[in-house]
Amino acid sequence: MWKFKPILKTTIWGGDRIAPCKGIQTDLDLVGESWELSGVEGDVSVVADGPEQGMTLTDLLSKYGAAILGERNYKKFGTRFPLLIKFIDARQDLSVQVHPDDEMAQRQGQANGKTEMWYVVDAAPGAKLANGFREAVDPADYERLVETGDIEKVLNFCDIKPGDVYFIPAGRVHAIGAGAFVAEIQQTSDATYRIYDYHRKDANGNERQLHTALAKEAINFNDTEGTAVKYVPRNDIPVNVAKCPFFTTNLMIVDEEVMRDYNELDSFVVIIVTEGDGTLLCGADAVSAVPTEMKVKQGDTVLVSASANGLSIVPGDKGLKLIETYVG
């Protein structure tokens, strides 16, 4: 099991909740994102401690290969980690945007597109997210809606609260609203087409670039299915909230020790702690000849190798809430 150093990103819309959530110190202002686990070129995660401390995620995959990723994932992705895990803190509204699917991204010279999901960690009063359209939009009206700033009028805005889950397939127009603090799970891609940005200016006084034409090509104009994922929380039992070709995600509320069996799972597992603290226990596997134990707390993200047969999750006195995600 590994933890990685967070890659903190300052943004014009960023806030001040990420560092307290993770229990870390930073001199940075307006931290909008923490990249928790990343194989994106130029922003590759680095192991925080343990025998491989200082090793990049790419080097770790070069060393252990399928023992970490799983046989199927290693054949498909090699040393390119297939998921990007983030925390996002929005002090202001993020831009209205869309991501391409794999086919379009590859036409643009990128490895893949971006399907993603959000888990709401915290939400200020009145916080909202936009996910898809309220009703189908005529593509012929798209550029007019962007030019007049009326694009927001056709979006499906949802009031949010902690624990809400939203799935965002490639091609769905979306936006994170002011006051939202989310954990994001996505394909490894930084392909984002900005549609509308409230005429905000960067540090040099320039409005940020829009990608109106590319976005039009990427958008599914008939996508009106952006409501929150419906699920019933259950104690000590994983609850599935997302399953797609790119990732499967479960939520867990752990009040008593839980044993997760990964014998039939040909994939790494990522654990994201959203509340509480506890201990993860993993038996000996192809990566570690001895059992390993790791203390975890709110804001931690842990990578568990595919060669692990299972994971024992022991909650602290106040319990533990976590996200479990993998490819498969």
How would you name each of these model-derived features?
Residues 1-137, 197-227, 249:
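Transition-metal
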Residues 120-142, 238-241, 256-269:
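Short beta-strand/loop turn elements enriched in aromatics
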Residues 98-100, 121-124, 133-135, 146, ...:
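Short, structured patches in soluble enzyme cores that scaffold and shape functional sites
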Residues 130-153, 183-225, 317-319, 323-328:
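Double-stranded beta-helix
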Residues 154-167, 181, 283-286, 291-308:
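Short acidic-glycine-tyrosine-enriched beta hairpin
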Residues 78-80, 88-93, 102, 123-126, ...:
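Ligand-binding loop in jelly-roll beta-barrel domains
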Residues 232-283, 291-300, 308-309:
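Acidic/His-leaning functional-site neighborhoods
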Residues 85-86, 94, 116-119, 157-158, ...:
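His/acidic/aromatic-lined binding-pocket segments of jelly-roll/cupin-type domains
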